[in-house]
């Protein structure tokens, strides 16, 4: 897993991006070789795969949460499979209430509030657990580039601000794969944090399967206080923008690497920064679950997905999956 902040050259090419291109070519070749040699397995239920083409937050977790609520409302049984980023997980496990983010990943802890969740780093290990749970649908979070299992329905999430960055593969750029193939194969494309009617040029060929989505706060936060914001997620800028758009007075920011595991020393430093700014700490749900075992008084901004075409989503999901 790449534990980096999103470097500027991933968005706008410079000499560093070009110097890293030879490594990107190796990455591309290894990906091609992996896909060529893979023998995909059929999982024992219909599979909805939610993924993206690039490193960094694109709203996948919120899409998975939305799908979970949608399926639950239809009384469709489902299991969520998550990748256990940032955890010390050794083998696939069904998440229970006592699990921590360090054991199963921050996303797993969050998603477990919406239904049964299996955390794994190897997709093939989930089969016995799926057979025990017997779901109608498997929602797979962030295995889009994994060639070892069959996908019945794919959703590609795209951040409206970053799109596909500088267009280069890792590490010269943010791309896990070039987008055209993924977009062509996708059943739906979510353009996340899009507040405008204008569709980016690269997505215009896919307008018939494009859904505009916004990530919005799902609860009220006291707007009379000052806040010092911090996060260790893939797209912290979007989180900070959400805070400002919500009308909070943000006096300072601190960014940590994606899926960062906080130490007591980090917490003490954050409290010190908040005190300097006469502010209360505020963070994301993904970060907040890391502090379960630490004495803290941190405000958590919970968010949810709002989409412009729920009927299109319902039609495609229940028609094909």
Swiss-Prot record:
<dbReference type="GO" id="GO:0005886">
    <property type="term" value="C:plasma membrane"/>
</dbReference>
<keyword id="KW-0067">ATP-binding</keyword>
<dbReference type="GO" id="GO:0009245">
    <property type="term" value="P:lipid A biosynthetic process"/>
</dbReference>
<keyword id="KW-0547">Nucleotide-binding</keyword>
<dbReference type="GO" id="GO:0005524">
    <property type="term" value="F:ATP binding"/>
</dbReference>
<dbReference type="GO" id="GO:0009029">
    <property type="term" value="F:tetraacyldisaccharide 4'-kinase activity"/>
</dbReference>
<dbReference type="InterPro" id="IPR027417">
    <property type="entry name" value="P-loop_NTPase"/>
</dbReference>
<dbReference type="GO" id="GO:0009244">
    <property type="term" value="P:lipopolysaccharide core region biosynthetic process"/>
</dbReference>
<dbReference type="InterPro" id="IPR003758">
    <property type="entry name" value="LpxK"/>
</dbReference>
<comment type="function">
    <text>Transfers the gamma-phosphate of ATP to the 4'-position of a tetraacyldisaccharide 1-phosphate intermediate (termed DS-1-P) to form tetraacyldisaccharide 1,4'-bis-phosphate (lipid IVA).</text>
</comment>
<feature type="binding site">
    <location>
        <begin position="54"/>
        <end position="61"/>
    </location>
    <ligand>
        <name>ATP</name>
    </ligand>
</feature>
<keyword id="KW-0418">Kinase</keyword>
<keyword id="KW-0443">Lipid metabolism</keyword>
<dbReference type="Pfam" id="PF02606">
    <property type="entry name" value="LpxK"/>
</dbReference>
<keyword id="KW-0441">Lipid A biosynthesis</keyword>
<comment type="similarity">
    <text>Belongs to the LpxK family.</text>
</comment>
<keyword id="KW-0444">Lipid biosynthesis</keyword>
<keyword id="KW-0808">Transferase</keyword>
<protein>
    <recommendedName>
        <fullName>Tetraacyldisaccharide 4'-kinase</fullName>
        <ecNumber>2.7.1.130</ecNumber>
    </recommendedName>
</protein>
<comment type="pathway">
    <text>Glycolipid biosynthesis; lipid IV(A) biosynthesis; lipid IV(A) from (3R)-3-hydroxytetradecanoyl-[acyl-carrier-protein] and UDP-N-acetyl-alpha-D-glucosamine: step 6/6.</text>
</comment>
